[in-house]
Amino acid sequence: MGYFIDRRLNGKNKSMVNRQRFLRRYKSQIKQSISDAINKRSVTDIESGESVSIPIDDINEPMFHQGRGGLRHRVHPGNDHFITNDRIERPQGGGGGSGSGQGNAGQDGEGEDEFVFQISKDEYLDLLFEDLALPNLKKNQYKQLTEFKTHRAGYTSNGVPANISVVRSLQNSLARRTAMTASKRRELRELEETLKALENSEPAQLLEEERIRKAIAELKQKIARVPFIDTFDLRYKNYERRPEPSSQAVMFCLMDVSGSMDQATKDMAKRFYILLYLFLSRTYKNVDVVYIRHHTQAKEVDEQEFFYSQETGGTIVSSALKLMDEVVQERYDPAQWNIYAAQASDGDNWADDSPLCHELLAKKILPVVRYYSYIEITRRAHQTLWREYEDLQAKYENFAMQHIREPEDIYPVFRELFHRQTVDN
């Protein structure tokens, strides 16, 4: 009775190597699909991964074929409409509806739908936050924030052909063949010695010599059947993500919850901050996050209250900046911490308060932070706060501004604010 031994180590994911190769090959199309999909779902809904669709034309293999232009001579069966040397005009639009994707309908022809497949939670987050990093991150005196980088980590028994280690695979092949044939080779040597002794003995023992020769031939066949290389022998260079100490960092999240922020605007602000939280927790092992809500008064709150509290009031943006400055002085020494801030507001502020915000940022906050981002969420025209901040953007490289009008603007704005930059040591 024969047995099949499954030596594959991928468990249920027996096509993982092919899947990873596919994700690398069509990364740009997949990232575009994810960018489109994030606007149609909650950013917190990541447990189920994401269904990704790729136009079928993008994954078809290239092929040579005749172009649609020019004149071609064909021989067709005759009928009562056409005679020899008649010219037949091509149908407008290039044919009768064959093709894929969106376009005009045709009465005949065939096409294919977009290719749709499911990616996991980890694959979704890796692609979502690829090429993003905290800007201007520098190494300070105390290193607690941990980044992950890819390093060589020995060998593994599964991987892609590009990472195969020929030397290690041949070493394993030699060891396996030696172990599997050692007893047979030892028996073969004994039989050969016995046969040699019988050939030199008197009188000749022909029947015994013939039996030993058959046994020797069978042993040689068994040894020859042991494959030179087996999938069990293959070894691939292994790579793993290792935590590397970097500078410690803190992110201040300042959210306007005043009465001018309607529910739709607040929801967009929360979605931006949830995206920021997922990015920080996914990319960095240790990072402090300080949540500040403000209307006429600012208050440091926990994560639950920041996202779900219903408290509201008037608008004095400077109250949040003053509180941030106090927290920095009390807990986060700029010489030891990389300080970041993300402020979201609808831009509506008490008229006399906007110049004070400009002064607080210019004199106290921007000199000590690595990066300060302001996100204005409104469909209306910009007001005094935006104009005050525009002056800061022109003077300070570590100050950035973006405008969100619709929910579909959130992810592109987020990527623009936190795209990976050169890191100073």
Curated annotation (Swiss-Prot):
It holds the Pfam family DUF444. InterPro entries: UPF0229. Residues 84-110 are annotated as: Disordered. Residues 92-108 have a biased composition (Gly residues). Signal peptide: none annotated. Belongs to the UPF0229 family. This is UPF0229 protein YE2273. It comes from Yersinia enterocolitica serotype O:8 / biotype 1B (strain NCTC 13174 / 8081).
